[in-house]
Amino acid sequence: MNMTTGRRGIVWKTPDITADGLKMFACIVMLIQTVGIAVIEKGLIHLDQYTQESLNQAMSQDSRLMTLAGIGSIMQLIGGMAIPVFAFLLVEGFRNTSDYKKYLIMMAVTALVSEIPYDLSICGKVWDFSSQNAMITMCICLIMLKCLDLFKETSGFTGGMLKVLILIAAIVWVSIFRAEYGLCMVLLVFVFYVFESKNVLKTVLGCIISLMYVTGPIAFYGIWCYTGERKNRINKYVYYAFYPLHLLVLGVIANYIL
């Protein structure tokens, strides 16, 4: 437990949060977000059948529909808090991994396995090219981190230009793939890596970027309380499995049960 003494002698206590704690928090809020999209919007409201105008008209005549739409929107806002945490943990994982290739391969395999569950739950189809899952964004971010690491000793104008070019390349790739969390995730990962030792600047920039998802800045409280402890009480493969499994289960519920 960290303690800070205020101007009037008041002692403020902040919790000690481990990597496991951050992972669990991110998974829970991501689950809430997916329930909001897959179950509420796709399964109960059938949002795709409405235009914005017809939806507004339907809600004005149906209080149940309005309530469901409101709940779905709130759940998606809650999910926005997961993005900064996942970005932060990705950078931490990159810095601490003993085998980058294995790390990237595991991420890529999870991305491939997750695509059909993602399309089913988020797009309402077994196969859809309109957007791709967030693990693809993380793979691109990992490659970006490796490129940044290769040129970390390059300083001055050349070093700065290389960093910018690598960042632009990553943004282009997530845009081509239309990957979930794309621009926000890439920018956050870049900030967390490049400004690692500048906690205040890193937090301010991260909060500004996270406003893309409205509630994102709230997650920085947990990141600020992170202790650096990475001992996994829960097997890391559980987290890899959680992403495609929760998408698959909610996708099946939304499309074949409701």
Where are these regions (language model features)?
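Alpha-helical transmembrane segments and their immediate juxtamembrane cytosolic regions
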Residues: 1-258
